[in-house]
From Swiss-Prot:
It is found in: Cell inner membrane. Keywords: ATP synthesis, Cell inner membrane, Cell membrane, CF(1), Hydrogen ion transport, Ion transport, Membrane, Transport. It holds the Pfam family OSCP. NCBIfam families: ATP_synt_delta. Its main location: membrane. It comes from Desulfosudis oleivorans (strain DSM 6200 / JCM 39069 / Hxd3) (Desulfococcus oleovorans). It comes from the Bacteria. This is ATP synthase subunit delta. F-type ATPases have 2 components, F(1) - the catalytic core - and F(0) - the membrane proton channel. F(1) has five subunits: alpha(3), beta(3), gamma(1), delta(1), epsilon(1). F(0) has three main subunits: a(1), b(2) and c(10-14). The alpha and beta chains form an alternating ring which encloses part of the gamma chain. F(1) is attached to F(0) by a central stalk formed by the gamma and epsilon chains, while a peripheral stalk is formed by the delta and b chains. F(1)F(0) ATP synthase produces ATP from ADP in the presence of a proton or sodium gradient. F-type ATPases consist of two structural domains, F(1) containing the extramembraneous catalytic core and F(0) containing the membrane proton channel, linked together by a central stalk and a peripheral stalk. During catalysis, ATP synthesis in the catalytic domain of F(1) is coupled via a rotary mechanism of the central stalk subunits to proton translocation. This protein is part of the stalk that links CF(0) to CF(1). It either transmits conformational changes from CF(0) to CF(1) or is implicated in proton conduction. SUPFAM superfamilies: N-terminal domain of the delta subunit of the F1F0-ATP synthase. The gene is atpH.
Length: 183
């Protein structure tokens, strides 16, 4: 929980600056680009977060990568601040929170849909339209498959989970039968 509080605090601060100078979307792309480099180059992440390396050496590595990425002065300052405050290891979480905040600002919500099998484009579009109607926002749907669901889908939008999987229905029936209830 503590990490989320830290991540949200920095993400909200960056969003305030982004709203103020109308560069929130640019910062979203730059921060996401930096996190992509971390994901691709594990040695880079270790070089900037490992306390066994001297601070100045870590700073030089960070500065070189930031320079190569060609990010804005604001993003350069933001990443330097994270480094100075020893929060650079939270940059992935900050990025995730920031992406969601910018999407929220633009009236976009992300939905994770997990199905037992592959969904046709028509079905995905119907799910998207229905979620959009329900939330009143534009919905971006991320699809995943999980054969253990047996059938149906599980949809997660923010904190709300809609579980229409056969696996859950069977589990609920099993519990009802154990309790001696009618199904």
């Amino acid at each position: 929980m503590k990490n989320y509080v830290i991540q949200r605090r920095y993400a909200k601060a960056l969003l305030l600056i982004g709203k103020e100078d109308n560069n929130a979307e640019q910062y979203k792309e730059e921060l996401n680009g930096f996190v992509s480099v971390l994901d691709m180059e594990k040695a880079f992440e270790s070089a900037i977060t490992n306390p066994l390396y001297p601070v100045e050496a870590r700073r030089k590595v960070l500065d070189m990568v930031i320079e190569k990425l060609g990010v804005s002065v604001m993003m350069r300052s933001f990443l330097a601040l994270l480094f100075e405050k020893r929060r650079i290891q939270h940059v992935r979480g900050i990025n995730e929170v920031y992406q969601n905040l910018v999407d929220e600002l633009k009236g976009i919500v992300r939905a994770d849909v997990v199905s037992a099998g592959e969904l046709s484009d028509d079905v995905v579009e119907k799910i998207r339209a229905s979620l959009s109607k329900m939330t009143g926002k534009q919905v971006i749907v991320d699809i995943a498959q999980d054969p253990t669901l047996i059938g149906g889908i599980v949809t997660k939008v923010g904190d709300m989970v809609l579980d229409g999987s056969i696996k859950t229905q069977l589990s609920n029936m099993k519990e009802s039968l154990k309790k001696g209830e009618r199904v």
